[in-house]
UniProtKB/Swiss-Prot annotation:
Gene (name only): rpsH
Oligomeric and partner information: Part of the 30S ribosomal subunit. Contacts proteins S5 and S12.
GO BP: translation
Matches recorded under Pfam families: Ribosomal_S8
InterPro entries attached to this UniProt entry: Ribosomal_uS8 (IPR000630), Ribosomal_uS8_CS (IPR047863), Ribosomal_uS8_sf (IPR035987)
UniProt keyword terms in alphabetical order: Ribonucleoprotein, Ribosomal protein, RNA-binding, rRNA-binding
Taxonomic placement: Bacteria, Pseudomonadati, Chlorobiota, Chlorobiia, Chlorobiales
Highest taxon of the lineage: Bacteria
Protein name: Small ribosomal subunit protein uS8
Keyword Electron transport: no
Family annotation (HAMAP family): Ribosomal_uS8_B
GO molecular function: rRNA binding; structural constituent of ribosome
Organism for this UniProt entry: Prosthecochloris aestuarii (strain DSM 271 / SK 413)
Length: 131
């Protein structure tokens, strides 16, 4: 059965792998998911990612990050904009949880955090929030 919301599938795979204490998880490839993975590495929520092109289909292998006491680096990750209800924010974007968490947006300048979008003066679709 095809996945209707590939971003929600990506987030669910990360969440489930973190709860199961897996070191890595494999996610079907898309350019948008690769850009999200790159942003999560920059912000320190995942350790690393690798794009693997196999014979059948390409996928992204994500290395998960855990704290010294074994807790998953991502405390909460929630999809905001869904296929049935799109959520957009303008350039006057407010901080998520007073700056403690991040909103990840899809903008005309690529995948950005809420802080980067405010600095560049752009708005866009709010993909998900992370804490």
């Amino acid at each position: 059965m095809p996945v209707t919301d590939s971003i929600a599938d990506y987030l669910t795979r990360l969440r489930n792998a973190g709860q199961a204490k897996n070191k890595t998880t494999d996610i079907p490839y898309s350019t948008q998911k690769e850009n999200i993975s790159k942003l999560l590495v920059e912000k320190g929520y995942i350790k690393n990612y690798t794009v693997i092109t196999s014979d059948r289909f390409p996928f992204i292998r994500v290395e998960l990050k855990y704290g010294s006491n074994g807790t998953f680096a991502i405390k909460e990750i929630t999809r905001v904009s869904k296929p049935g209800r799109r959520v957009y924010e303008g350039k006057d974007l407010r901080k998520y949880l007073g700056g403690l968490g991040l909103l990840i947006l899809s903008t005309s300048k690529g995948i950005l955090t809420d802080k980067e979008a405010r600095e560049q003066g752009v708005g866009g679709e709010v993909l998900f929030r992370i804490l």
